[in-house]
């Protein structure tokens, strides 16, 4: 039994790392064991260093949010208010959990008779109960400030060292002498740090503000991590670094817009969101296909020719480009409403979500009048990174996470 299991695992491992699938013709994994120059060639063992680094990044994040982001939030006027617990009531709790969080008028009257409470009191109970589950604005601001800081720093680092790389200016050099392209120190740090950050996102999902797209984002992060790992082991790190940098370009603007929203700076929020939309569309609908897809599809075909994993990576990049087009359409819709109304309105991509300090009176009234209201629309994710900006009570509301990074990197959408 043990021998059969070992043989099965051996076959599975051999299939997973099949040279005929992952590498060009006449290239073997043994060929990439040589030292090369600098940090040598990418190896699977290098990926192991990602896990302690991910823990370090996660720890730095906790310290950053506690000692830097929180004081900044308080300074811009965000309150550190405790969540007020609603009066316990088993009957209403059962309805809230199992039936609806937004009872209609008929149900309210029935509960009123059953509990001998006024309809108004029951309305207030449900409103406070909803707010009890919603994250404080302070928490969301701190999360966005951390992501803003990381995205800005990693983008600056990436563009600084890529600027001096010949393959940044001539993408054909991503494929000359492939896969015998040794790692530089800067490229090694850049790739491993990015991969570690995505692993830290996996950890933090379980303590971050819970979104309706939790499962989707979990799967999205897993796929992004797998693709980024494979691209590293496969030594597609040059073009992978270009994709990283391009996807990092717009993310700081989104997080900045969300912070402005949480701080109730509506005009600044709208301005930043419109700038973000322009940056996203230019980078994803113009630069990505003309710069990235051109080199991965045509230049690589001419220089090294196709092989099985080449088709896989390009298929994923084409799917990513389709998502870019969909996301851009939704961003244009939201930006158009922002410009016409003077503020960011409901983002069709995102969950509508208020903090525990805010009350959703408009949604509540719509329910009582029989209109349908939703606590969210489909979220927008991507990359390889996601973003959710919404309007509640006529104010600029930023919610969710825009991780266009899922496979930026060959991701995830904060």
UniProtKB/Swiss-Prot annotation:
Start and end residues of each TLC domain: 139-340
TM annotation in the entry: 44-64, 148-168, 187-207, 214-234, 272-292, 312-332
Name listed for the protein in its UniProt record: Ceramide synthase 5
Source domain of life: Eukaryota
Glycosylation site residues: 26
Catalytic activity: a sphingoid base + hexadecanoyl-CoA = an N-hexadecanoyl-sphingoid base + CoA + H(+); sphinganine + hexadecanoyl-CoA = N-hexadecanoylsphinganine + CoA + H(+); hexadecasphinganine + hexadecanoyl-CoA = N-hexadecanoylhexadecasphinganine + CoA + H(+); sphing-4-enine + hexadecanoyl-CoA = N-hexadecanoylsphing-4-enine + CoA + H(+)
Gene transcribed to yield this protein: Cers5
Note on domains (UniProt): The last loop motif confers selectivity toward palmitoyl-CoA (hexadecanoyl-CoA; C16:0-CoA) as acyl donor.
Principal cellular location given in the protein's record: endoplasmic reticulum
Stretches assigned to the Cytoplasmic side: 333-414
Segments in the Lumenal topological domain: 1-43
Substitution effect: residue 140 to R: Does not affect ceramide synthase activity
Annotated spans, Homeobox-like: 75-136
Motif Last loop motif, residue numbers: 299-309
UniProt keyword annotations, A-Z: Endoplasmic reticulum, Glycoprotein, Lipid biosynthesis, Lipid metabolism, Membrane, Phosphoprotein, Sphingolipid metabolism, Transferase, Transmembrane, Transmembrane helix
Example GO biological process: sphingolipid biosynthetic process
Expressed in which tissues: Ubiquitously expressed, with highest levels in testis and kidney. Expressed in pulmonary epithelia.
Subcellular location: Endoplasmic reticulum membrane
UniProt xrefs under InterPro entries: HD, Homeodomain-like_sf, Lag1/Lac1-like, TLC-dom
Gene3D superfamilies registered for this protein in UniProt: Homeodomain-like
């Amino acid at each position: 039994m043990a021998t059969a299991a070992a043989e099965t695992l051996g076959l599975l491992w051999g299939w997973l790392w099949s040279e005929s699938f992952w590498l060009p013709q006449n290239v073997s994994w043994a060929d990439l064991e040589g030292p090369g120059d600098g940090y040598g060639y990418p190896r699977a063992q290098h990926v192991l260093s990602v896990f302690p680094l991910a823990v370090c990044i996660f720890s730095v994040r906790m310290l950053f949010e506690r000692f830097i982001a929180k004081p900044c939030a308080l300074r811009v006027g965000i309150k550190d208010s405790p969540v007020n617990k609603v009066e316990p009531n088993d009957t209403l709790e059962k309805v809230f959990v199992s039936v609806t969080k937004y009872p209609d008028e008929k149900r309210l009257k029935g509960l009123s008779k059953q509990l001998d409470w006024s309809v108004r009191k029951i309305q207030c109970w449900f409103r406070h109960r909803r707010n009890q589950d919603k994250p404080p604005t302070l928490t969301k601001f701190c999360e966005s400030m951390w992501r803003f800081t990381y995205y800005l720093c990693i983008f600056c680092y990436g563009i600084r060292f890529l600027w001096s790389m010949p393959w940044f200016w001539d993408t054909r050099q991503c494929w000359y002498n492939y896969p015998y392209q040794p790692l530089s120190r800067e490229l090694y740090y850049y790739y491993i740090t990015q991969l570690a950050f995505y692993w830290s996102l996996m950890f933090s999902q379980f303590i971050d503000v819970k979104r309706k797209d939790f499962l989707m984002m979990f799967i999205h992060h897993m796929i992004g991590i797998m693709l980024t790992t494979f691209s590293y082991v496969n030594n597609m790190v040059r073009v992978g670094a270009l994709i990283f940098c391009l996807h990092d370009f717009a993310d700081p603007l989104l997080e900045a817009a969300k912070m402005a929203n949480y701080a109730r700076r509506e005009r600044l929020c709208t301005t930043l969101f419109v700038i973000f939309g322009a940056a996203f569309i230019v980078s994803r609908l113009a630069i990505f296909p003309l710069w990235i897809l051109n080199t991965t599809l045509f230049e690589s075909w001419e220089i090294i020719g196709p092989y099985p994993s080449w088709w896989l990576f390009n298929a994923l990049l084409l799917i990513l480009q389709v998502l870019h087009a969909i996301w851009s359409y939704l961003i244009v819709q939201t930006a158009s409403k922002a410009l016409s109304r003077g503020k960011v309105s409901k983002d069709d991509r995102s969950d509508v979500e208020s903090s525990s300090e805010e009350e959703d009176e408009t949604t509540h009234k719509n329910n009582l009048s029989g209109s349908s209201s939703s606590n969210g629309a489909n979220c927008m994710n991507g990359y390889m990174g996601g973003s959710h900006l919404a309007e509640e009570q006529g104010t600029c509301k930023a919610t969710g996470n825009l991780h266009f990074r899922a496979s930026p990197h060959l991701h995830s959408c904060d």
